[in-house]
Amino acid sequence: MKQLTLAMAVDQCAGFGAQRKPTRREAFLDEMNRLVPWAELCAVVEPYYPKRGSGRPPIALERMLRIHFVQHWFNLADLACEEALYDSLSLRRFVGIDLGSETVPDATTLLKFRHLLEEHKLGERIFAEVGAACCRRAALKSGTIVDATLIGAPSSTKNREKARDPEMHQTRNGQQWYFGMKLHVGVDSQSGLAHSAVVTAANVHDKHPLPQLLHGQEQRVYGDSAYASQKALIRGKAPKARDFTNKRTRRKDSVDEVARRKNRNKSKIRARVEHVFAVVKRLWGFTKVRYRGLAKNANRAFVSLALANLFLSRGRFTAQVRP
């Protein structure tokens, strides 16, 4: 290892230097810092957060919320996040921690904050608040795309209970069997932002949460063939909506080419729902559950969707939020 020079020390301690290039992580955190409505989200959590009393004062709420979002963005467990904050200057800057005068919140503190959000179902309220902020910038249009994605869970019984998670179930997709849960979402057909979500076990059919994924003002509803022939469910929630779900094209040994072409045109719009899943599963890393039970993982899913909406809207709304 090279001897630590003055320039290296300045770079490590302050992050400045003539030869230094801003990293993609720093650029991402700077952009999220501008986009996230911190005051509104803190107002959602504040009624349930510990108040200052005679004992040790609680850590600032916004700081804990920033750390919680860092865990989602970089798919970090509690202990891994604590160590990452000690290791990364860019993360400490985003959170607002100065190691010269204070320490990083430990893993137990992060665990208790997450349990607070789970206990009061604040992940869903954070998702709703971010959705409201996005609606203020770009109102919901007249179409909704509905879809579901599988989130895997450990199927092994080699654990203390010698059993799998009883709230998770298995289902078949094509010729492959999966064990876990399903994340159902409703996405605005114009903006591509998620406005509703439901978490179920994997064996629940896609059509059952359909009414909960509609806001009621739709003119069109898009979905894959799993939602075919569900006009009654759609009109029960959105009376003016037209059914634009994909139709089944194979009849015995023949293929309906007309229906196939129509499905292809619908899928050009329907594909926007995959952008949300790509951010949640590929960028945020939420491909497998981290906790037991649906409630804890649902809280993570709602926060992940809220952050995905902010990420997907960054190009359109960054200019509006810059000082």
Named regions from a protein language model:
Residues V44-R56:
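Short, Lys/Arg-enriched N-terminal segment that forms or immediately precedes the first helix
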Residues V276-V279, L283-F286, N309, S313-Q320:
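Hydrophobic alpha-helical segments
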Residues S54-L61, R292-A301:
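Structural motif
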Residues M1-A39, E46-P47, A319-R322:
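Charged, often Cys/His-bearing segments associated with DNA-binding zinc-finger transcription factors
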Residues R63-N75:
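Alpha-helical support elements that line or immediately flank enzyme active sites
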Residues Q3-T5, V10-Q12, Q219-R220, S225-N299:
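Helix-centered, glycine/charged polyanion-binding patches within enzymatic domains
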Residues M1-Q3, A7-D11, L61, L79, ...:
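Polybasic low-complexity intrinsically disordered regions
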Residues E40, Y49, M64, E82-E83, ...:
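A detector of single, family-specific signature residues
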